């Protein structure tokens, strides 16, 4: 169990996992058939006081993979035109190789042994990330293939709401609905929400965990008071 000093280090906070916040924008809900169109990745770090904060963000517009399905309803919802040359889109492979490089660098600097995806309704984002990695036969992914931190679940527990915009506002985080459904904007708001939840839990005394000796003393005090 980490001591009070170690608990302020990122590599001791999440069992050696390096949290990486991700948001994707897609051309549908099916990771097997629908195009991945945009991805943003926000790295996190802990300051000297053990407060989790945003570090840096990388962002890519993605070219639809060959034969990808483009659902008109999805494109109308996120406002993305995959054919627009001004997007500056790159291939899935190019984007993920750069993401791997950036994440591994941050993971190493934090002395963590693996990265774990943080996302709002994380199963959706994780499915598209995993399928893109598989489709491009990319090796040595830094990400855990199935474990994740879902901020929808965490926000529902800690704040009382699962919708990103409403959870952010309830947490005191500015959220502009006009900017929503951009991977870049949503990723950074999700990162702020995750940091808020983690830091609030620490402020309430939930972290670091009490040692067995401390727990024994607290239990004894409770018995005396009762």
Curated annotation (Swiss-Prot):
In the UniProt record, the gene name given for this protein reads rnt
Q: What is its EC number?
A: 3.1.13.-
> What InterPro entries is this protein classified in?
Exonuclease_RNaseT/DNA_pol3 (IPR013520), RNase_T (IPR005987), RNaseH-like_sf (IPR012337), RNaseH_sf (IPR036397)
Taxon lineage: Bacteria, Pseudomonadati, Pseudomonadota, Gammaproteobacteria, Alteromonadales
* Residue intervals of the Exonuclease domain: 20-194
Oligomer and partners = Homodimer.
Where does this protein come from, organism-wise? Shewanella denitrificans (strain OS217 / ATCC BAA-1090 / DSM 15013)
Task: Give the residues annotated as coiled coil.
Answer: none
- Positions of Mg(2+) 2 binding: 23, 25, 181, 186
GO-annotated molecular function: 3'-5' exonuclease activity; magnesium ion binding; nucleic acid binding; RNA exonuclease activity, producing 5'-phosphomonoesters
Q: Which CDD domains match?
A: RNaseT
Where does the record place the catalytic residues? 181
Q: What protein am I looking at?
A: Ribonuclease T
Recite the UniProt cofactor note for this protein.
Binds two Mg(2+) per subunit. The active form of the enzyme binds two Mg(2+) ions in its active site. The first Mg(2+) forms only one salt bridge with the protein.
